[in-house]
Amino acid sequence: MAYHGSGPQSPGEHTYDDGHQLRDLSHSNTSYEEEASHGLLSSQQSPFAGPFDDPHQQRGLTASPVQRPTSGYSLTESYAPDAAYHDPYSANQSVYSGHSENPAAAFGVPGRVASPYARSETSSTEAWRQRQAGAAGGGNGLRRYATRKVKLVQGSVLSVDYPVPSAIQNAIQAKYRNDLEGGSEEFTHMRYTAATCDPNEFTLHNGYNLRPAMYNRHTELLIAITYYNEDKTLTARTLHGVMQNIRDIVNLKKSEFWNKGGPAWQKIVVCLVFDGIDPCDKDTLDVLATVGIYQDGVMKRDVDGKETVAHIFEYTTQLSVTPNQQLIRPTDDGPSTLPPVQMMFCLKQKNSKKINSHRWLFNAFGRILNPEVCILLDAGTKPGPKSLLYLWEAFYNDKDLGGACGEIHAMLGKGWKKLLNPLVAAQNFEYKISNILDKPLESSFGYVSVLPGAFSAYRFRAIMGRPLEQYFHGDHTLSKQLGKKGIEGMNIFKKNMFLAEDRILCFELVAKAGSKWHLSYVKASKGETDVPEGAPEFISQRRRWLNGSFAAGIYSLMHFGRMYKSGHNIVRMFFLHLQMLYNWFSTFLTWFSLASYWLTTSVIMDLVGTPSSSNGYTAFPFGKTATPIINTLVKYIYLAFLLLQFILALGNRPKGSKLSYLASFVAFGIIQLYVVVDALYLVVRAFTGGAPMDFNTDDGIGAFLSSFFGSSGAGIIIIALAATFGLYFVASFMYLDPWHMFTSFPAYMAVQSSYINILNVYAFSNWHDVSWGTKGSDKADALPSAKTTGGKGEEAVIEEIDKPQADIDSQFEATVKRALTPYVPPEEKEEKSLDDSYKSFRTRLVTLWLFSNGLLAVCITSEGLDKFGFTNTSTERTSRFFQALLWSNAVVALIRFIGATWFLGKTGLLCCFARR
């Protein structure tokens, strides 16, 4: 059930909305829109006042509805007696200790000071830091809580179960809540583990464990969401989409697999890996706390002085929060109800990059859970209806499939309004064509060069061994352990290669010795993601992609011989050889793309714009007088902006040169459209007759081919245009997905030259920038430490605050309010840094110097300047220039000589009359 308030509704295409209010979700694809259109913080309609009010208790009542408290978040009905509940203040339960609790942490008590839990005027980060101290008993107030003694596993591993708020417990359907076969605390307690070890040491032998393994459950599907600093809307978009996809899998009725070995939901684990406390958006933590997978105040900075590396939370929940900040909870046993989902939340204490997050996923959690399939998602990627099911089915039906990916397409907004941005439209077209032409081709060969980390899947046993070993060489946290094989011992080429580490994993998987794993593309599985909307972000993103893919592509070609050690059959090896030749050829074309684009532009303009005997002394489009002049200007502008790209790339960050890059995109776009018009003119002339396209169609096929492929090159241009325009249209209609040809193709044609002239130039000019290391500082000082107590011969224990359930619920009420507050994007400051301003001045100075000198050289030596009114020939202009230059140098030398002579004479005279 979705709870609605007064916010605006914003449904979009291919989303999850059925537009219903306070109704169960239907099981059709239309149910995949975020189910709510209004904010939860407005007044609620009776009889269900709050998001956690239990509708089961209301059904069948004929009397007047039960009176609720005035709060829209009343948890009164959630304080139901529970056999597992105990009062920490009652006798024989625990003893009081010196731990104090900030009185501001208590809620609903008149006269209490404002709490950081409800403080809206304080930044979310600062309020979060205060909550850690307050909730953990580190405040300066007088409130005292009872404590309990927690034994460390094997004397060193801190793993504690914390009661979840009553509202979360009671949101679980009774059939799951009352079933104690799996685990008595699975739905009543959240498990927290402070991992003070490297991911490779997170093993059962060292005392670490995970709930699914503790409950002896087989994990078929491990769904991982990697996160850096995305806001709560982006995170909820991904997490809610995953929850709905799991519902699709659980609702399968005829699947032989899911009817074996217990309920389907027990075979699926969702793992969120956050890359550092400091960059993490603290509002996102409120969303996770609302569904039960996180609590404030339980994390420990260190255990007996040993620093915590990762904070791991585990809980099984039936709650979800939509991107519109609407809370979804089960209401009945219908197909629209979300099933229980086993969740793990790994919050790394320090930012150590995405590849390290994957090491936690595969080497730490994967080895304990031993899943069959791992699905990788980036926070912000929204899986489409049944997308995860289609990915899993691909592995289920192909025992040799080692990895797969779905179709990623750009998020276009409501009514496709983002297509008005040419950059977004161009990227949309690029993604679509890649999914129509490139991915199917590579899938046919059996080796997809890259499975995007934002939306891909791997068979866990396929990547175990050498593939993961090679993959994790790029983890800088292993640099000391690996030595020369690690990131610190790599040359600049290998470091760039690990900017596209997913390509390395794909190659190593296919080339795995003694195995015959192949990769595939699953067209039915779709994911939606945001794309950069501004030039600086776009350029920075593509720098990493282009440099990483180029280096990884060369690596795979140079190490192709390792394929002979694999277990592929002769047919597969034949196709892999074809793909190798195709990749060599593509790399060759990519290397010379800069010159190719300039020559193509120049040749097409000369063909249609230069009057000659071969074209009847005509010129398109401005006539035989103006067209050559304009074409010459266009060429000079093209070369000038191309030179500018090198100046910008070698000295500036894209964010520090926004206007320059914007002007470059516009200039190259206008030139590209001008060339496209010229090329279309060639095609028209080819089929209407007329020089230079007057093909011989009267003397047989031989004469026609001879004229078609003649020295003018017009026939080749027609073939290239047909291969570009025609192939894109035909393939798009074959895949029944042609809309991008009408909405995005024109924008792509305008931006296409910028892909070469701007993106490639910037990428290669910044080959040295591999962006390794942590981003920013890592602040964990807000977290309390855990210290053991106990004398000699006694087991090491830690005293942990044992809060009463009423206080847990009161604090949770404020957490829900924060989580469901409508998201307001922060304003981005456009101010340049001091370093950027210095670099911008340097760029303007160098640009002025180079272009003024270049303009002088062109004016003196160019033969075509007579078109601009210069009456002299280039030879005569050169002669006069040298005369002026020689006279100028002579005058300067004469002045210097006069000055030197005067100084010498003056010095001699003064020497004679100087006083001794």
Curated annotation (Swiss-Prot):
Membrane spanning stretches: 544-561, 588-608, 629-649, 664-684, 716-736, 845-865, 884-904
Stimuli inducing this protein: Expression is ubiquitous throughout the fungal body and relatively independent of the change in developmental status of the cells.
Sequence ranges of Basic and acidic residues compositional bias: 14-26
Post-translational modification: Activity requires trypsin activation, suggesting a zymogenic nature.
One GO cellular component term noted in the UniProt record for this chain: cell septum
Annotated membrane topology: Multi-pass membrane protein
Bias-annotated ranges (Polar residues): 59-75
Pfam families membership: Chitin_synth_1, Chitin_synth_1N
Disordered, as annotated region: 1-75, 118-141
Reaction catalysed by this enzyme: [(1->4)-N-acetyl-beta-D-glucosaminyl](n) + UDP-N-acetyl-alpha-D-glucosamine = [(1->4)-N-acetyl-beta-D-glucosaminyl](n+1) + UDP + H(+)
Main location: membrane
GO BP, one annotated term: chitin biosynthetic process
Catalytic activity, EC: 2.4.1.16
Molecular function GO labels: chitin synthase activity
This protein's UniProt keywords: Cell membrane, Cell wall biogenesis/degradation, Glycosyltransferase, Membrane, Transferase, Transmembrane, Transmembrane helix, Zymogen
Reported phenotype of the disruption mutant: Leads to severe hyphal growth defects with enlarged tips, a high degree of branching, and disorganized lateral walls.
Free-text function comment from the UniProt entry: Polymerizes chitin, a structural polymer of the cell wall and septum, by transferring the sugar moiety of UDP-GlcNAc to the non-reducing end of the growing chitin polymer. Does not substantially contribute to the rigidity of the cell wall but is necessary for normal hyphal growth and organization. In addition to its functions in the formation of normal cell walls of hyphae, is also involved in conidiophore and conidia development.
Assembly notes: Interacts with kibesin kinA.
Family, as annotated: Belongs to the chitin synthase family. Class III subfamily.
Domain notes: The N-terminal disordered region controls its phosphorylation state and is required for its proper localization to the hyphal tip, but not essential for septum formation.
Protein name as it appears in the record: Chitin synthase B
Species for this entry: Emericella nidulans (strain FGSC A4 / ATCC 38163 / CBS 112.46 / NRRL 194 / M139) (Aspergillus nidulans)
High-level lineage: Eukaryota, Fungi, Dikarya, Ascomycota, Pezizomycotina
